[in-house]
């Protein structure tokens, strides 16, 4: 375990310390028991002293009961510490991801993050729980048992002094060989989980194109590769068992030979030899524990590296010390803005963008696929930082604002509409968790969603399931618009968010915006000219450059790109009629 991950122990430090403490007490009792057995055999049984046998036998039972009690307490403490540590680790990863910018998130796949928070954390939890118990138990058991063996017979003790380092070195060698293979296994788990996620999310597309067999074959290929990698790792780890067994049998054979000779020549009593055999088993069992924990640690090390990648990731965007917490108005300025997703030196998605949007204006943005319309608006709430230049909101550079304060005043309905499991009411209240039912209904009326919501038997308490699969695309878009409106933002951005809505409903939404939220700056990205035709200004984008700004009439007269789009849609529609 590295220091980054150990910080997550926090309030479970007490249990993490108590577990090995009780393990030490348990081991002390277990180590003293064979010594008592030797006395019972050599003094009690061999001399026929019944009272001595009873007296020492009672002490033996008490020791055994104490060992059992300490073992139970140690197990309980280790379980609490392990489960608590895993809980904190999950929280830490989840909280860290919440701090990430889009650029940070782009470095990790969704399935990779899910695997880290489930499989990887479970591996680390098991290794931690085993470590604080067995890694405390095994070394102490080996040392104390060896000391007791040394007191009974120096020759046999010397035998173990040779065997233990040899075995330990072999186990470490096996662990180092297996570790890289386990890393590959868990990286491949990400791909496997991603395949499952894609298939489930796109199940309707898969069935529509009758691609079930193709998906099964693809999944089988990935699954088989995971199996191959895991088998390679396990084949290396499998050497632990034969190495351990060979060591145990060799040690026992040598020990019996040495011990038998010592008894024959009167250097040892039978009871002492019995104790030495018990101590030998204790040492061997401790070594087997180390082997078992080593396997767990090997797996956990690969998981630890992957978890640390997330926790060590530095958020691209952080608030300044005296960040501004209030946005004055919805005025927006782009001043010589360049942007690249790859950062400095990468291919530019936006090139020398200069733009001024007055507070309260309705702005339309139009352009072909790949013209960076979405990229442009994502810079306003600072979902990404500019590569060069400045984006200003309310007269200030967006980097001067507290991120939460800025994004609270910039509502954005993204291209991919996302609804969460819960009622319609709960989904809308994502925009403002303290909103009343009246406020929720008001924004739903503005978004033209109130009508279809009331047609559901449960109305606003209708459950949304599986990211909104029980509502249509147009209904989903209107619910997302209502959610954005509930924030009462100074800037509202609709990124092609009415594409699944019919033209009549689209017109009603725009009319409601004009009448009900005139002071809010409204930016509408659309493929339909009719959705932005009446905007105060229309921005024409092409390959990351602004090719024209003006009203629809002005652009028809001066901008060839806009004129072609307009004529293809408006005149094309007339021809269809």
Residue spans for each PLM region:
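Transmembrane helices of ABC transporter permease
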Residues: 11, 15-28, 39, 59-63, ...
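An intracellular "coupling" helix at the cytosolic face of ABC transporter transmembrane type-1 domains
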Residues: 11-13, 99-103, 119-132, 136, ...
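Membrane-integrated ABC transporters
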Residues: 1-30, 37, 45-60, 74-78, ...
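Juxtamembrane helix-loop junctions of ABC transporter transmembrane domains
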Residues: 21-22, 29-38, 42, 50, ...
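Hydrophobic alpha-helical transmembrane bundles that constitute the permease/transmembrane domains
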Residues: 20, 24-32, 65-72, 124-127, ...
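Short intracellular "coupling" helices and adjacent cytoplasmic loop segments at the cytosolic face
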Residues: 47-48, 83, 91-115, 119-121, ...
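Helix-loop-helix
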Residues: 49-55, 144, 148-162, 232-306, ...
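ABC-type nucleotide-binding domain
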Residues: 326-577
């Amino acid at each position: 375990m590295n220091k980054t991950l150990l910080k997550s122990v926090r309030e479970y430090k007490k249990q993490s310390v108590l577990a090995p403490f009780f393990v030490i007490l348990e081991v002390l009792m277990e180590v003293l028991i064979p010594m008592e057995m030797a006395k019972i055999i050599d003094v009690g049984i061999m001399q026929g002293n019944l009272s001595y046998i009873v007296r020492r036998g009672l002490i033996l039972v008490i020791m055994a009961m104490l060992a059992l009690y300490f073992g139970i307490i140690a197990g309980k403490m280790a379980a609490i510490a392990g489960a608590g540590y895993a809980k904190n680790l999950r929280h830490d990863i989840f909280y860290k991801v919440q701090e990430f910018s889009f650029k940070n998130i782009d470095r990790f796949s969704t399935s990779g993050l899910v695997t880290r928070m489930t499989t990887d954390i479970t591996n680390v939890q098991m290794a931690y729980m085993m470590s604080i118990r067995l890694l405390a138990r095994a070394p102490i058991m080996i040392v104390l048992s060896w000391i007791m063996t040394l007191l009974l017979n120096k020759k046999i003790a010397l035998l173990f002094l040779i065997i233990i380092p040899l075995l330990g070195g072999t186990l470490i060698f096996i662990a180092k060989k297996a570790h890289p293979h386990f890393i590959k296994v868990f990286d491949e788990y990400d791909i496997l989980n991603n395949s499952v996620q894609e298939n489930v999310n796109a199940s309707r597309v898969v069935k529509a194109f009758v691609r079930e067999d193709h998906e099964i074959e693809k999944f089988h290929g990935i699954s088989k590769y995971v199996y191959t990698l895991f088998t390679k790792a396990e084949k290396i780890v499998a050497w632990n068992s034969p190495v351990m067994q060979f060591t145990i049998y060799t040690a026992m054979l040598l020990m019996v030979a040495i011990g038998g000779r010592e008894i024959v020549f009167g250097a040892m009593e039978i009871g002492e030899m019995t104790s030495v055999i018990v101590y030998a088993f204790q040492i061997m069992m401790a070594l087997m524990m180390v082997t078992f924990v080593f396997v767990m640690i090997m797996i956990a090390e690969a998981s630890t590296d992957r978890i640390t990648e997330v926790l060590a990731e530095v958020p691209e965007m952080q608030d300044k010390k005296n960040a501004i917490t209030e946005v004055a108005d919805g005025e927006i300025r782009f001043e010589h803005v360049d942007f690249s997703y790859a950062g400095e030196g990468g291919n530019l998605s936006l090139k020398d963008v200069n733009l001024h949007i007055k507070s309260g204006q309705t702005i339309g943005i139009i352009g072909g696929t790949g013209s960076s319309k979405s990229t442009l608006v994502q810079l306003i709430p600072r979902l990404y930082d500019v590569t060069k230049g400045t984006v200003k909101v309310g007269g200030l550079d967006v980097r001067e604002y507290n991120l939460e304060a800025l994004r609270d005043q910039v509502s954005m309905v993204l291209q991919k509409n996302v609804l969460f499991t819960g009622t319609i009411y709960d989904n809308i209240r994502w925009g403002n968790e303290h909103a009343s039912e009246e406020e929720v209904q008001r924004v739903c009326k503005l978004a033209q969603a109130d009508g279809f919501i009331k047609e559901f038997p449960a109305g606003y308490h209708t459950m949304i399931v599986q990211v909104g699969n029980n509502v249509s695309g147009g209904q989903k878009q209107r619910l997302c618009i209502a959610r954005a409106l509930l924030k009462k933002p100074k800037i509202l951005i609709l990124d092609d968010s009415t594409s699944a809505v019919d033209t009549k409903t689209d017109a009603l939404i725009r009319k409601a915006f004009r009448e009900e939220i005139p002071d809010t700056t409204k930016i509408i990205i659309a493929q339909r000219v009719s959705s932005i035709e009446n905007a105060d200004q229309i921005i024409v984008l092409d390959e990351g450059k602004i090719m024209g700004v003006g009203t629809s009439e002005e652009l028809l007269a001066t901008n060839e790109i806009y004129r072609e789009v307009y004529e293809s849609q408006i005149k094309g529609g007339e021809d269809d009629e």
